[in-house]
Amino acid sequence: MLILAALIGFLAGFASTAFRWMIEFFGIVFSTKGLSWLGITGTALPFLLPLMPMFGGIVTGIICHFFPDAVKENGVHRVMHAVALKAGKIRKRTLITCSATSALTIGSGGSAGREGPTVQIGSAVGSALGNLFHLSRERVRVLVGCGAAAGIAASFNAPLAGVLFALEIILGDFTIHTFSPIIVASVIGTATGRALEGNEITFHVPVHELVSYSEIILYLFLGLLCGLVSRLFTLVYFKSNDFFEEKVRIPKILKPALGGLIVGLISIGFPAVLGNGYDFMEKALSGELLWSMAFLLIFLKIISTSVTLGSGGLGGVFAPSLFIGAMLGSAFGALVHDISPNLTASPETYALVGMGAVAGAVMQAPLTNILMLFELTNDYTIILPIMITCIVSAYTFRGFSKNSIYIQKLLKEGINIQHGREV
């Protein structure tokens, strides 16, 4: 089992890294450089660049029309469904369709993240190997978790978070027979990713610290705000899904293009909403954003992500959740720091804490996101604020809904899964 876990770690690590390369490739194609390949330069560029998400949506819509499994089996919630009800069976062809459509969506500027497709890709590798060797249902489930862990670990250079993601979200099982192979897969996946991409952290941040213990009160309040904003995000997300499904009376093949057009129009004034938003998160973490801009971007990112995914674009919600949290934390931190500069940390510190708090609430996985945040930034100096804010945010969210965004998706389909099992 451990040998298979190691093999899955290598294959899933390679596949998830290749998926990152696909996103980067499409990012070049749908850019000024890509347009220059077609001989388009000069004054036409400012008018065409906002249309890139729409062009990406057109191609995505065509692929999804001819390969509907790309939509039906895409996302973390579909992996959870496969683990709980389908003995871990995930169709092998979703590796290609999921990779292509998600990379197109994100690379062309659609507001989405890569964690959902990465989990899908890694899990499909684990499922394929488990079924190839005709293993038992329970062992295939574990191997699916191994693939998910390795994919996350390789893609984000985050081995601990990969392990916790698989155990806390995908399997809902912390027993030793699942823990050991998942650790092996995550380690090998991380090593593979580092061999291909280098040992780089995702975000480069200055040193942060807790200025005074009285500041914990402010972090408690930030946690409350993050929980409320997380709930707003999920509400708008599902409303957007319903709107495009029920109210938009155009052929389904064209809906991703419409969503891309809307996001492209928003990006004319606010290019930060495009893609995963990592560049602008870096700005928030280095104190380069005005609080008013950060505050506005909270809501624009919620709308852009909801429109992208609701219209039929493919991608994950982790990166948008990090973005929303970074903007909320930055705006909140700037305000409290202006009021009391000697007793509070810099806005960058609050931006960092807000990232984990919003993502932890949306996913209802605070422990995973606490560790993920440390590994994305390599910053362990503010563990107390991060822990308390993530927990308060998650429990504030639970005051409105006890289920993560993934479980809520399944509930809308009439499927109730808790701890990796159908209820």
Task: Please provide the spans of the model-predicted regions.
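Alpha-helical transmembrane segments and immediately membrane-proximal extracytoplasmic
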Residues: M1-V423
